[in-house]
């Protein structure tokens, strides 16, 4: 019987994994643009210790890409209350440091405080919880659908986090309006106004319970029995005694949780080695903290881990590194900021770093990836296109001139993109970027866990790969001109400024 149950569970799990490898397709003509626009947040919800800004998910560009965006600012000692969403999230830390946690149902609480004696009362109950991790500027944090997430700023610098929600991922069985299900508090839903505009009165009723969190609508008696607590605690659970504003609250005396040592600033390969050491330490923590009694529970835990293996064959391939990770031991963050080793680097033009599921396996489950780029003033990212993904680009610093061209050869965007603005670059649309500032940088969220780009100019371009005669006849050039077109640009992706504009080199 147990074997049959395990087989059925694995079948259901892998069926779900295969299903989530595909994204819902946009409706007909939803991705046909005569013009793209630089987008800015159009709604802001203030909290006691921060602010959450949102972009309208009903905007045509975001609907085409099937995503929603928000920007969260958390002040010193600010705690973002635990919540989960109806779609996977990819979070980029633009600024600041702190700690965060994800709560995976069924995983053990492997972090526990030392047992203490209370005077005259014997041992005090230990606090145990699931793992807590540090984050820093440049980190990508992956949050699967329906997994509760919280974060806390324990530094002086405000934390700024950019979140992409993949609303067309098939893990989302609702509509394309993102929903944040808070576990506590009494706060406004950040995307509620878009639900009301899109869905009318029916949607207003959906968000209209009096407490504002997922427990608020239950009867007091239900919660008393479920948690085995008194009526006063139930009132707090439902948010009735909580007059703190919003979903980010101030922890005046600082948050006391069991967490690993604070990350030390590192550079380049040292930082990557530190992350590898942290990953091994996380695995060791799980082994050390696993109870050695109750054999039946231990077997049940191991069975649970086996059932929850993450094998998302997004591209119908064998596991790429021969390893399988369980939900309970997954690596949840990966740094792609300035301090990491770039994938492409030109000392006079800039650097690029791409994060895919090959580096960060949980992205296979989410079906997402990310790219960080910094381009020096007057340097160019050659014309290219995203082969198999939409790209949602957010400007972190500075400004740059963007040109985006559709399949008919029309420039659907030709203008400046500034700090804090977003541009959606649809799949296969050609794009070129020229930096207007020395500190221009961006993060781009990609809707494929192994995104590919194809250059249209330069050393690795499609045109360079064509036979000379094909280039000559396709572009109506003589052979010498065709040879120049193929070979004159010796750079792969990032082209330095013209010689007259190059920065002086000591």
UniProtKB/Swiss-Prot annotation:
Expressed in developing cotyledons and in the embryonic axis of germinating seeds. GO terms for molecular function: nutrient reservoir activity. Residues 270-280 have a biased composition (Acidic residues). Residues 195-207 have a biased composition (Low complexity). Residues 306-315 have a biased composition (Basic residues). Disulfide bonds join 31-64, 107-328. The keyword ATP-binding does not apply. Residues 111-131, 195-216, 251-322 are annotated as: Disordered. InterPro entries: 11S_seedstore_CS, 11S_seedstore_pln, Cupin_1, RmlC-like_jellyroll, RmlC_Cupin_sf, Seed_Storage-Functional. PROSITE patterns: 11S_SEED_STORAGE. Pfam families: Cupin_1 (PF00190). Keywords: Allergen, Disulfide bond, Glycoprotein, Seed storage protein, Signal, Storage protein. Glycans are attached at residues 397, 439. The keyword Disulfide bond applies. SUPFAM superfamilies: RmlC-like cupins (SSF51182). Residues 36-235, 334-483 form the Cupin type-1 domain. Residues 1-19 form the signal peptide. It comes from the Eukaryota. Sulfur-rich seed storage protein. This protein found in the seeds of many leguminous and non-leguminous plants is the source of sulfur-containing amino acids in seed meals. Hexamer; each subunit is composed of an acidic and a basic chain derived from a single precursor and linked by a disulfide bond. Component of globulins complexes which accumulate in seeds. Belongs to the 11S seed storage protein (globulins) family. This is Conglutin alpha 1. It comes from Lupinus angustifolius.
């Amino acid at each position: 019987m147990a074997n049959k149950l395990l087989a059925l569970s694995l079948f259901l799990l892998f069926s779900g994994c295969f299903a989530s490898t595909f994204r819902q397709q946009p409706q007909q003509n939803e991705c046909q643009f005569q013009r793209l626009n630089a987008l800015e947040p159009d709604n802001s919800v203030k909290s006691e210790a921060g602010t959450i800004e949102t972009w309208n998910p009903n905007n045509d560009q975001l609907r085409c890409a099937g995503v929603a965006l928000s920007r969260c600012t958390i002040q010193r000692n600010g705690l973002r209350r635990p919540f989960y969403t109806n779609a996977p999230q990819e979070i980029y830390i633009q600024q600041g440091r702190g700690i965060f946690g994800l709560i995976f149902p069924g995983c053990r609480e492997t972090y526990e405080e030392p047992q203490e004696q209370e005077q005259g009362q014997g041992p005090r109950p230990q606090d145990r919880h699931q793992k807590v991790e540090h984050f820093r500027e440049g980190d990508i944090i992956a949050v699967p659908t329906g997994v509760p997430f919280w974060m806390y700023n324990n530094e002086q610098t405000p934390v700024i986090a950019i979140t992409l929600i993949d609303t067309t991922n098939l893990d989302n069985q609702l509509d394309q309006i993102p929903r944040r299900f808070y576990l506590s508090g009494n706060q406004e839903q950040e995307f509620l106004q878009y639900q009301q505009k899109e869905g009318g009165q029916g949607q207003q009723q959906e968000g209209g319970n009096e407490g504002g969190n997922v427990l608020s609508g239950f009867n007091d008696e239900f919660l008393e029995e479920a948690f085995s607590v008194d009526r006063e605690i139930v009132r707090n659970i439902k948010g009735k005694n909580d007059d703190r504003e919003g979903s980010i609250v101030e922890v005046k005396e600082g948050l006391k949780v069991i967490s690993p040592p604070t990350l030390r600033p590192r550079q380049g390969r040292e930082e990557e080695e530190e992350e590898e050491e942290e990953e091994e330490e996380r695995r060791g923590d799980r082994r050390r903290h696993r109870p050695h009694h109750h054999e039946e529970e231990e077997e049940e835990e191991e069975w649970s881990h086996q059932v929850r293996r993450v094998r998302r064959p997004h591209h119908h391939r064998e596991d790429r590194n021969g390893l399988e990770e369980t939900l309970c031991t997954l690596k949840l963050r990966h740094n792609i900021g300035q301090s990491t080793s770039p994938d492409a680097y030109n000392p006079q033009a800039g650097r690029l770093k791409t994060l895919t599921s090959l580096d960060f396996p949980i992205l296979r489950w989410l079906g997402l990836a990310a790219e960080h780029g910094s381009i020096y003033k007057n340097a160019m990212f050659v014309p290219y296109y995203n082969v198999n993904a939409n790209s949602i680009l957010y400007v972190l610093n500075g400004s740059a001139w963007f040109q985006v061209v559709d399949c008919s050869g029309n420039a659907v965007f030709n203008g400046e993109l500034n700090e804090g603005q977003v541009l959606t670059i649809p799949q296969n649309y050609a794009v070129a970027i020229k930096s207007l500032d020395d500190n221009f940088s961006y993060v781009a969220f990609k809707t494929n866990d192994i995104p590919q780009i194809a250059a249209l100019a330069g050393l690795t371009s499609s045109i360079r790969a064509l036979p000379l005669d094909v280039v000559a006849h396709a572009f109506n050039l003589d052979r010498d001109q065709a040879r120049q077109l193929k070979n004159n640009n010796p750079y792969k992706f990032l082209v330095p400024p013209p010689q007259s504009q190059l920065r002086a080199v000591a």
